[in-house]
Amino acid sequence: MPIGVPKVPFRNPGEDDISWIDVYNRLYRERLLFLGQEVESEISNQLIGLMIYLSIEDENKDLYFFINSPGGWVLPGIAIYDTMQFVPPEVHTICLGLAASMGSFILVGGTITKRLAFPHARVMIHQPAAAFYEAQAGEFVMEAEELLKLREIITKVYVQRTGKPLWVVSEDLERDVFMSATEAQTHGIVDLVAVQ
């Protein structure tokens, strides 16, 4: 039987009564964001909304973005990345568990010097994929062109944010490349590995 989202006690400033709110709401109030699922439009919009709201509330207080994601859709992931670059607060990205595909793209998008992986975390990068098998010939060509544009965007971001040469990033994106936290640090995807 699923337990649902745990509830925690919370007292609003200046109030005597305690109310019970879900744990994520409580953590959002502390500027802690979580991506613990596949990247798709709904979670992307929620995280974008939270980042914008929290930056309006206090543009000088950092955001902490925890990632444990198998990846997901490219455009919703790029939207999260773009928002991270747009909002005034610095965004710390923290990988726990797995940051694969779009999860690693979001991880690398954190403020440089403030990207961290837990010691047993795994990171995976690869090129974007599409479902060509159902497309008509004309759609196939258009989708291939769009995919090339997206690959170019993703490659440029990894080059810019990791400091690796274009040829290294391009070669790595050709296949699934899994990394330990230390390897991700060497690769420039994270800046620090948390100590045990």
Swiss-Prot record:
GO terms for biological process: protein quality control for misfolded or incompletely synthesized proteins. The active site is at residues 101, 126. InterPro entries: ClpP, ClpP/crotonase-like_dom_sf, ClpP/TepA, ClpP_His_AS, ClpP_Ser_AS. Its EC number is 3.4.21.92. The keyword Chloroplast applies. Keywords: Chloroplast, Hydrolase, Plastid, Protease, Serine protease. The keyword Chloroplast applies. It comes from the Eukaryota. It catalyses: Hydrolysis of proteins to small peptides in the presence of ATP and magnesium. alpha-casein is the usual test substrate. In the absence of ATP, only oligopeptides shorter than five residues are hydrolyzed (such as succinyl-Leu-Tyr-|-NHMec, and Leu-Tyr-Leu-|-Tyr-Trp, in which cleavage of the -Tyr-|-Leu- and -Tyr-|-Trp bonds also occurs). It is found in: Plastid, Chloroplast stroma. GO terms for molecular function: ATP-dependent peptidase activity; ATPase binding; serine-type endopeptidase activity. It is an enzyme of class 3 (hydrolase). Gene3D superfamilies: 2-enoyl-CoA Hydratase, Chain A, domain 1 (3.90.226.10). It holds the Pfam family CLP_protease. One of its GO terms (cellular component) is chloroplast stroma. HAMAP family: ClpP. Cleaves peptides in various proteins in a process that requires ATP hydrolysis. Has a chymotrypsin-like activity. Plays a major role in the degradation of misfolded proteins. Belongs to the peptidase S14 family. Component of the chloroplastic Clp protease core complex. This is ATP-dependent Clp protease proteolytic subunit. It comes from Vitis vinifera (Grape). The gene is clpP.
